[in-house]
C-alpha cells in the first residue's frame, strides 16, 4: 500500500513535549519517514481504538531505552496524528485513564 500521501498532524501536547525533549525538525522528519514505511507496523496499544507506539532513540539511549511516540493512522483521512511523546525513564506506559482519554480522541478524529 502507498502511504506516501499521508499528512502528519501534531497535537499541541506532542509539539510541546517534542520541543521540551530537545528533539529537532530533522529528528521529526526521520520519525515521519519511518512511520510512512508502514504506519501499521508499530504495535497497537490495547484499549485505545488503534493508537500505536513507536520507539525512538533519545539522548545516549538507543530505541529500547529512549522515547516513545504515540500516534494513530486514520486511513479514511490519509492522516497520521502524532498524539504524544514520552521518555522511557520518565514514564513506562500509558495509564488506564490516559488510554480512555486517547480512545475518545481517536473516535472524535475518525468522526470529524
Where are these regions (language model features)?
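Arg/Lys-rich, positively charged N-terminal/basic patches that mediate binding to nucleic acids
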Residues: 1-26
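Membrane-topology and secretion signals of cell-surface/extracellular proteins
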Residues: 1-3, 15, 34, 48-51, ...
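Anionic group-transfer/hydrolysis microenvironments
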Residues: 12, 55-57, 86
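Compact soluble domain cores
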Residues: 13, 23-43
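A short, surface-exposed loop/turn module that caps and links secondary-structure elements
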Residues: 34-63
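Short, surface-exposed coil-to-beta transition loops
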Residues: 64-69
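Enriched for short, Lys/Arg-rich terminal
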Residues: 73-112
Amino acid at each position: 500500500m502507498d502511504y506516501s500521501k499521508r499528512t502528519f498532524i501534531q497535537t499541541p501536547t506532542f509539539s510541546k513535549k517534542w520541543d521540551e525533549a530537545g528533539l529537532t525538525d530533522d529528528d521529526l522528519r526521520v520519525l515521519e519517514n519511518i512511520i510512512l514505511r508502514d504506519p501499521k507496523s508499530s504495535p497497537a496499544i490495547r484499549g485505545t481504538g488503534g493508537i500505536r507506539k513507536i520507539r525512538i532513540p533519545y539522548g545516549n539511549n538507543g530505541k529500547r531505552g529512549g522515547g516513545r511516540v504515540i500516534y494513530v493512522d486514520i486511513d479514511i483521512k490519509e492522516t497520521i496524528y502524532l498524539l504524544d511523546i514520552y521518555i522511557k525513564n520518565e514514564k513506562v506506559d500509558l495509564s488506564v485513564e490516559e488510554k480512555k482519554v486517547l480512545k475518545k480522541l481517536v473516535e472524535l478524529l475518525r468522526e470529524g
